[in-house]
Amino acid sequence: MRKLCVFIAILCLACGTHAATVWIDTDVSIGSPFREVDDAFALVLAFHSPEIRITGLSTTYGNAPLGQTTRAARDLVQRFGRSADLTVDHVFAGAGSASDLGRRSGASDALTAILQKQKVTYIALGPLTNLATFLQLHPKMANRIERVIFVGGQAPGVSLAFGPTRSFHIHDANVFKDSAATGTVLRSNIPLTLVPTATGSHLLVDGADLRQLERSGGAGNYLSHESRIWLWFWTHFVKTNGGPIFDALAIVPMTRPELLSIKKRYARMDEAGNLVVTPRLTNGARTVRDCTGFALETKRFVLRRLQQAPRKGEAPAEPLGR
């Protein structure tokens, strides 16, 4: 309770800005070998973006277990959150698995406290269990969420395959891990923008990009150092031209939307639990906005933002003892 009170007090002090108010839900796993790093790229991009004001972060399972994602989120905020006026008191643990759907958590309590005071855009970088739980617990507050931006959705029959022979396949992870939660959010009729994995797979960083980030110091150096094994996996095992930072693209609708191709589409849950997106209205579908592509400038924009110099008081980029 004390932590929640401190969090609300910090929030009230920050309410004077004109930046868009967002809540970010993340399964960040940077710092562990062979884990995805794209959530961390997305979070640092958000920290460095004056167009948005982050009112809180919730953690969820997905890329790693909840305890690990919560530690990673707090570590990242402690290092680089100062630029966004964030402290570890802004990070709340949520669902540990799909079986936690509907179960109250620190994340659901904190989001409720926020929405009692103001509306937010909810950016979901992981499975939708936390948001669906909130909607089940507080259905009358759904209209307090102005929009959901979600990394998920796919065209029917499309396989997410990578590499020169298209032999490395992945599923639509955030949907796959809790399709029931995805269905709950879809039925809520909150305005929904989808940033599909298939689209984000084209936003690649390579060795030259990591060296550029390393030279910039601060958060860029940290991301570069912690992404080396991840990049090796994508370039040597999957044999792509770089590593995809899927989740970073989900921040761009709030910062540089003109860089994106966003089209009106229709989404529904199919019998297999997939979030299917089509250009034509089908039975049981609802309208969504779908990110189908992005301008070449998008990668340059992301890299520039990641390289912003840390403000006075930010933690050093060298890895802390784990």
Report each predicted region and the residues it spans.
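Positively charged n-region of N-terminal signal peptides that target proteins for export
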Residues: 1-4
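Hydrophobic, well-ordered secondary-structure segments
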Residues: 11-12, 126
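Conformational coupling and interaction surfaces
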Residues: 20-21, 41-49, 53, 173-176, ...
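Metal-dependent C-N hydrolase catalytic cores
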Residues: 24, 65-116, 121, 271-277, ...
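Sec-dependent N-terminal signal peptides
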Residues: 6-8
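Active-site histidine-anchored catalytic micro-motif
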Residues: 20-56, 60-71, 84-87, 98-200, ...
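A broad structural signal for alpha-helix termini and local helix breaks/kinks
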Residues: 80-81, 138, 255
